[in-house]
Regions:
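Membrane-embedded transmembrane helical bundles of large multi-pass transporters/channels
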Residues: 1-35, 41, 91, 134-379
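Membrane-proximal, lumen/periplasm-facing interface regions of secretory-pathway glyco-
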Residues: 37-45, 379-388
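Structured non-transmembrane domains adjacent to transmembrane bundles in polytopic membrane proteins
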Residues: 45-65, 70-163, 386-478
C-alpha cells in the first residue's frame, strides 16, 4: 500500500485532473436522477393501501384526491370554479353536490347525506380527483395549477398538497442547510487545525465526494427526497474523520522523513487506508443493514450512504493527498497556534476520576430510558411542517368548516349485494373517528336499478368495483 501511496503522491496533478473531470458526469447524473416524493412507492406491494391505490389508478383512472373548502361564495360562482378546475390537466374529475342535486334547490331540500358532506353554513366542499398517484409529478403540477386558479376563499387540502409543499421546501432549503453545515464544520476545523488553508481543502475534498455520490445515484434511477435531503450532511459528518486522520499521519511522517514530502504522504496514505478501512467497513455495514427494512425507503438511504462512505474513503486517499501536496506552501504560510492546543488537563481529569464518570452516566441512563419510553411518536407528516404552509392552513380550514381533515375511498366488489353493503356501511359508521359515509346506495337508495342512475352519479362506478367515500377525523382515532 505504501507503493500505491507514493505513486498517488508523485502523480498528484493527475489525481486532481481526474477529480475535476469526474465533476462533469456527476453533474449530469444529478440532473438525470429523479427525486421521488411518493412514500407509498416504498411500501410492499402486498399491503392493502398499495393494492387499493393500484386499483384506483388502473380501473378508476385516478390515484389521488384533494378536498377543497370554499367559503362565502355564491353557488353559481362555485359551479364556475368547478368547471375551471375540471379543465386543469391531470384532473380526472371534480365532485360537488351539483352532480346529484340542482344548485337551485333550497339547502333544506337537499338530501341529508349530501348536505352533511358538501355544505356547512357559508362553506361548501368539492372533491378534486387526479388521474395519477398522490405524489406523482402530474398530480403535484395539477395541484399547483389549482392553487393559481383558486382565490383567497378557496382552501385545497390533501396529501398531494402536503407533498407539493414538502418538495418546494426541500428545493429551497437544501442548499441553505448544506452551506450552514459546511460553515459550522469550517469553524470547528479552523479552531482545531494548525493552518487556515487546511479546512478549506478538507471541505473541497469531501464536497467532491458528495458530488460524485449524488451523481452516481443515476444507477438507481431515482432516490427519495428524504435521501436527497440527508445525503450531503450525513456524508460530511461521517467522512470528516478520515481527512483529519490523513493530515495527522502526514504531519507525523514529515518528522520521520524530513524534506521528503512525497514519501511522507505515501506512508500517510498507507497508514490512513489501513486504519480507515476498518472503521468505514463497520459504517458501511450499518447503512447496508437499512436495506433489509420492509419499508424500501431504508434500502434507498442505506445504498446511497454506504456508497457515499466508500467514495469518501477513496477521495480521502486520492484527492485530499493531492490537494495537500499542491497547496503545501500556502498551508505552511498560514500556520497558526492551535486554539485548542492542549487537552491534556481535561483528559487527565477524566481518566483520574473515571469511576465518578461511570456512575454519572449510569445515573443519566435512568431518565434517558424514561424519556425514550414516554416520548410520543407522530406519524402525521403534516405535523412536521410549519402551520403557515398552504397545505396546513387548508387542512385547518377544512377541519374548522366540516369537522374533518381526512378522507378515504373504499372499493367494493361490484357483485356485492346491496344488503351486505348496507351492513358494512353501518358498521363503518360506528367506528370511532368516522364522521360520515357516502356511497351510491346512500345517495339514490339501494333499490334503484343501474339504468336509472344519473350519468353524473354513475361515473363513480366503474368496471368491477364500486367506490365509497369515508370522511374521518384522525385525531379521534387512537
Amino acid at each position: 500500500m505504501v507503493k500505491v501511496g507514493k505513486w498517488i503522491a508523485r502523480h498528484r496533478i493527475l489525481m486532481l485532473l481526474i477529480g475535476v473531470l469526474l465533476i462533469i458526469p456527476s453533474v449530469i447524473g444529478i440532473a438525470k436522477t429523479k427525486v421521488n416524493y411518493d412514500l407509498l412507492s416504498y411500501l410492499p406491494d402486498h399491503l392493502e393501501t398499495v393494492k387499493g391505490q393500484d386499483i384506483l389508478v388502473d380501473e378508476f383512472g385516478m390515484g389521488a384526491f384533494s378536498m377543497v373548502a370554499v367559503e362565502n361564495m355564491d353557488m353559481k360562482d362555485v359551479q364556475k370554479l368547478e368547471k375551471e378546475f375540471e379543465k386543469v390537466p391531470h384532473v380526472q374529475d371534480v365532485l360537488w353536490y351539483d352532480d346529484v342535486a340542482d344548485i337551485s334547490l333550497p339547502t333544506e331540500m337537499i338530501p341529508k347525506d349530501i348536505r352533511k358532506a358538501f355544505i356547512n353554513g357559508d362553506a361548501t366542499m368539492m372533491l378534486v380527483l387526479f388521474d395519477d398517484t398522490t405524489s406523482s409529478d402530474n398530480s403535484m403540477e395539477a395541484l399547483t395549477q389549482l392553487r393559481k386558479i383558486a382565490n383567497k376563499q378557496c382552501f385545497i387540502s390533501g396529501m398531494t398538497g402536503i407533498v407539493t409543499d414538502i418538495k418546494n421546501i426541500a428545493m429551497k432549503e437544501l442548499p441553505i442547510y448544506v452551506v450552514i453545515a459546511a460553515l459550522l464544520s469550517l469553524v470547528v476545523l479552523e479552531i482545531t487545525s494548525g493552518s487556515f488553508v487546511v479546512p478549506f481543502l478538507f471541505l473541497l475534498s469531501i464536497g467532491l465526494a458528495i458530488l460524485y455520490n449524488l451523481g452516481s445515484n443515476i444507477i438507481l434511477g431515482e432516490t427519495s427526497y428524504i435521501t436527497q435531503a440527508l445525503t450531503a450532511v450525513l456524508q460530511l459528518g461521517v467522512t470528516m474523520d478520515y481527512s483529519i486522520f490523513l493530515l495527522n499521519s502526514y504531519e507525523e511522517n514529515k518528522k520521520r522523513f524530513p524534506g521528503e514530502k512525497e514519501r511522507a504522504m505515501g506512508h500517510a496514505i498507507a497508514n490512513t487506508f489501513k486504519s480507515v478501512v476498518g472503521s468505514s467497513v463497520t459504517t458501511v455495514a450499518g447503512f447496508i443493514a437499512l436495506c433489509v427494512m420492509t419499508f424500501a425507503l431504508g434500502r434507498d438511504l442505506g445504498i446511497v450512504m454506504a456508497k457515499g462512505v466508500v467514495i469518501g474513503v477513496i477521495c480521502c486517499v486520492t484527492i485530499l493527498p493531492a490537494l495537500i501536496l499542491v497547496f503545501d506552501k500556502p498551508i505552511e504560510k498560514t500556520r497558526h497556534k492551535l486554539l485548542l492546543s492542549n487537552m491534556d488537563r481535561p483528559s487527565a481529569f477524566i481518566t483520574k476520576h473515571y469511576k465518578v464518570w461511570i456512575v454519572a452516566f449510569l445515573v443519566l441512563l435512568l431518565p434517558a430510558i424514561y424519556g425514550n419510553n414516554h416520548t410520543k411518536i407522530y406519524y402525521n407528516i403534516a405535523d412536521s411542517l410549519p402551520a403557515t404552509l398552504n397545505s396546513n392552513v387548508s387542512i385547518k380550514k377544512v377541519k374548522d368548516d366540516f369537522g374533518t381533515s381526512n378522507m378515504h375511498i373504499v372499493m367494493m366488489d361490484k357483485n356485492m349485494s346491496a344488503k351486505d353493503k348496507q351492513q358494512m356501511f353501518k358498521k363503518i359508521d360506528k367506528v370511532k373517528g368516522v364522521k360520515w359515509t357516502i356511497s351510491m346506495s346512500s345517495l339514490i337508495g339501494p333499490s334503484v336499478p343501474d339504468s336509472m342512475i344519473p350519468k353524473d352519479v354513475r361515473r363513480v362506478r366503474i368496471m368491477n368495483w364500486h367506490s365509497s367515500v369515508r370522511n374521518m377525523n384522525p385525531q379521534q382515532i387512537r
